[in-house]
Amino acid sequence: MTMYERLMTLPIFKGVGTEQLSLFLEKTHLDFDNYEAGAVIQPLLEDCNGLKCVLTGRTEMVYTLSGGESRLVAEYGPGKVLGMERLFGMDTRPRHEVRALEPCGTMSFSKEQYMSLLRSNHICLINYLNYLNYHCQRIEVSMESLYSRSVAGTLAVIVSLMTDRDCRRIVLEGMDRLWATGPENAQADYDRQVDGLVDAGYVKFGNEGEIIIESRQSLLDYAESLQEQNR
């Protein structure tokens, strides 16, 4: 895959012609970096002052849940653009860390250069607005169509809100501790429901009680069907 072909797969350049992309590359100062497996690509709570595009390699995004009681780790392939949701607004510090799962290559450019691109290219502006719109709307969509008083519904809401559609694999750690703080029978009910999800193939167990979700969409579809049944 050529560099142009790789860049055309990035969501910020979706639908942009080769000539327009060439013009942007000619006018923009770009930083290219390489990361070894395990290296931090995006630190937690560091001010976002530009975009970083993952051109090669797999990454994982690590989120803390419930005040650190639990964690969600989401795996993504090449083509992820980091910083889009934190580039503007009152809080520009990402609430998750991004690490390299294998050697990764990135391309970065500043917020000012991206703003110049948005002013000069309406396709890129629409791409960015669509991205922000998706992130805003999925909150009410998730709560309306997925949430139910079940483990499947709770997991689906977390996954829907915290991960994107191109997520390859999700690992949830410490979810059992959330139910352990509930009523006396909550832990047993949690174990029973998770076992049912494992038997049905929606999740599987990892190390030390990890819940592994190989297909994000399958879990969301199942949770939505449960919500439909309860209406």
Task: Locate predicted features.
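Cyclic nucleotide-binding regulatory module and flanking cytosolic helices
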Residues: 1-32, 36-37, 81, 86-89
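A cytosolic small-molecule/anion-sensing beta-strand core signal
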Residues: 36, 55-56, 77, 102, ...
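Short phosphate-coordinating micro-motif centered on Lys-Gly-acidic
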Residues: 40-46
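Glycine- and acidic-residue-biased ligand/ion/polar-headgroup-sensing regions
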Residues: 49-62, 78-79
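A short beta-strand-loop-beta hairpin characteristic of the jelly-roll/cupin
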Residues: 59-71
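Cyclic-nucleotide recognition modules
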Residues: 72-130
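Polybasic "coupling" helices that flank or enter modular domains
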Residues: 122-185
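Phosphate-/nucleic-acid-contacting segments
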Residues: 160-231
